[in-house]
């Protein structure tokens, strides 16, 4: 600061010595010349700015701001890459879920077909069992009816035999009647 004051006094002394009748202009050093005074004030202002390191501070601030912007850009790039990674991961998971749902649908259809075939086979077995049971019942009813016919035929034969015996028929007539009764029973059974 001492040097600046000495420089200012040195530059201003010829202007003070010249007085008011000195020529005007920027290159005419006179304190009465406003252009010269403004130039000196501006130079003094610049000197003060440089003395206190304002350009370095401004440069540092601008560099810090540029570094901040650069770090924000790097962070934005990193976030973008992370977002792309997450997007790819979600797309992959979506494909996996879609494939899994397709597999589940395929398995469900296969299980439904298997269950339908199993139900059909169970129904066929049930029908076969019921038919067999019905046939057994029919055979049992036929056997029962056959026994009833035999019993009736035997009763008729016994009654006929009783009449023959009671009527006093001959032995040949009795044999003939017995043979006829046996043939009648045979016809009724078949």
UniProtKB/Swiss-Prot annotation:
Disulfide bonds: none annotated. It is a single-pass membrane protein. It is found in: Cell inner membrane. Its main location: membrane. CDD domains: ATP-synt_Fo_b. Keywords: ATP synthesis, Cell inner membrane, Cell membrane, CF(0), Hydrogen ion transport, Ion transport, Membrane, Transmembrane, Transmembrane helix, Transport. The chain crosses the membrane at residues 35-55. InterPro entries: ATP_synth_b/b'su_bac/chlpt, ATP_synthase_B_chain. GO terms for molecular function: proton-transporting ATP synthase activity, rotational mechanism; proton-transporting ATPase activity, rotational mechanism. One of its GO terms (cellular component) is plasma membrane. F(1)F(0) ATP synthase produces ATP from ADP in the presence of a proton or sodium gradient. F-type ATPases consist of two structural domains, F(1) containing the extramembraneous catalytic core and F(0) containing the membrane proton channel, linked together by a central stalk and a peripheral stalk. During catalysis, ATP synthesis in the catalytic domain of F(1) is coupled via a rotary mechanism of the central stalk subunits to proton translocation. F-type ATPases have 2 components, F(1) - the catalytic core - and F(0) - the membrane proton channel. F(1) has five subunits: alpha(3), beta(3), gamma(1), delta(1), epsilon(1). F(0) has three main subunits: a(1), b(2) and c(10-14). The alpha and beta chains form an alternating ring which encloses part of the gamma chain. F(1) is attached to F(0) by a central stalk formed by the gamma and epsilon chains, while a peripheral stalk is formed by the delta and b chains. Belongs to the ATPase B chain family. HAMAP family: ATP_synth_b_bprime (MF_01398). This is ATP synthase subunit b 1. It comes from Jannaschia sp. (strain CCS1).
